[in-house]
Design a protein with these regions (language model features):
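NAD(P)-binding Rossmann-fold cofactor-contacting core
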Residues: 10, 14-36
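Aromatic-residue detector
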Residues: 13-14, 18, 51, 126, ...
Length: 137
């Protein structure tokens, strides 16, 4: 999907030592493409690919119902960590690390901080208080 492709295209991963090795999708329009050197395979090839390639971290950017199923498949294949962008907190084997990323929560936090900054700015404009103390020489 779009988020998966955006992450695969992100240049800073490579600069920090992370390499996207392969992508998996169910969309026939995307399967067979190469994105930043990583081929897009059909999701059905997941287990076969992981059997032949040493992959430690998987990134999930799919709908909730598919994410749970794919996470179980990844665990059975020996994945050590999952970076999860699906709209669900994954419950996986104890020895598999999961980082659940909730984009909507992140956006809500950003929005809250922006509103708080606007209120502070408005208060400053109304009171003339810049927050800088006056010197009394």
């Amino acid at each position: 999907g779009n988020l998966g492709q955006a992450l695969a295209n992100y240049q800073n991963f490579t600069k920090r030592g992370f390499q996207v090795k392969a992508l998996f999708d169910i969309d026939p329009e995307v399967i067979g493409r190469t994105i930043q050197g990583a081929q897009v395979f059909p999701l059905e090839y997941l287990e076969a690919y992981l059997e032949k390639n040493a992959i430690d971290i998987a990134t999930l950017t799919l709908p909730r119902d598919r994410a749970i199923e794919v996470a179980k498949r990844l665990c059975r294949c020996g994945i050590k960590a999952i970076w999860n962008f699906a709209h669900t907190d994954l419950q996986v084997d104890e020895d598999v690390l999961v980082e659940n990323v909730h984009l909507s929560e992140s956006l809500m936090q950003l929005s809250y901080r922006m509103i708080a900054a606007r209120r502070k700015q408005k208060k400053t404009e109304e009171t003339g208080d810049t927050g800088i103390g006056e010197r009394s020489d």
